[in-house]
């Protein structure tokens, strides 16, 4: 198997990232996302680093995984949580260490930043495979449930 590399996403990745967002939303939540909206939203992150950053995992020059990191300020900790979001691993690359490499990269970068106090993510309550993966990587369920009012997707 070819070597896996992790890099920051750039403007040339927008279409691929957005396409993978749509595939992930359809697979995990049965939601068909609007292509133009996902392209605009993805481009917004690439153009404005204060929103977050994408990491891309490549093998043999092909994108096999990706995730988004966004930021949440914690006044309790006087620090920033990095949130892992929009995780996608190509179906043929699953169970080959792609997510682990992305995760380890995020945690390593987060630990190197003085103002980062932790890494969080949310996972669908029925996605037991992902929950096992996250637990195996040292993550544990938090004390919180997520509540929302979604003005776009309902």
Language-model features: locations:
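Conserved N-terminal entry element of GNAT/NAT acetyltransferase domains
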Residues: 1-15, 154
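Acetyl-CoA-dependent GNAT
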Residues: 8-11, 19-80, 85, 103, ...
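Hydrophobic adenine-recognition pocket in adenosine-nucleotide-binding enzymes
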Residues: 9, 87-89, 123
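A short, internal acetyl-CoA/4′-phosphopantetheine-binding micro-motif in the GNAT/acyltransferase core
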Residues: 84-94
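Conserved acetyl-CoA pyrophosphate-binding loop and the N-cap/start of the following alpha-helix
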Residues: 93, 97-105
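Conserved GNAT acetyl-CoA-binding A-motif
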Residues: 111-122
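Terminal substrate-recognition subdomain of acyl/acetyltransferases
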Residues: 112, 136, 145-154
């Amino acid at each position: 198997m070819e070597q896996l590399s992790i890099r920051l996403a750039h403007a040339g990745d927008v279409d691929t990232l957005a396409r993978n967002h749509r595939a992930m939303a359809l697979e995990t939540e049965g939601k068909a996302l609007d292509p133009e909206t996902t392209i605009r939203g993805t481009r917004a992150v690439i153009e404005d680093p204060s929103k977050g950053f994408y990491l891309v995992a490549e093998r043999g020059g092909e994108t096999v995984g990706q995730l988004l990191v966004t930021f949440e300020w914690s006044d309790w900790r006087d620090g920033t949580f990095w949130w892992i979001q929009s995780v996608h691993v190509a179906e043929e690359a699953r169970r080959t260490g792609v997510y682990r490499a992305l995760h380890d990269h995020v945690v390593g970068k987060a630990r190197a930043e003085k103002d980062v106090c932790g890494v969080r993510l949310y996972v669908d309550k029925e996605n037991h495979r992902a929950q096992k993966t996250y637990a195996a990587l040292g993550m544990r369920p938090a004390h919180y449930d997520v509540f929302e009012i979604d003005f776009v997707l309902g």
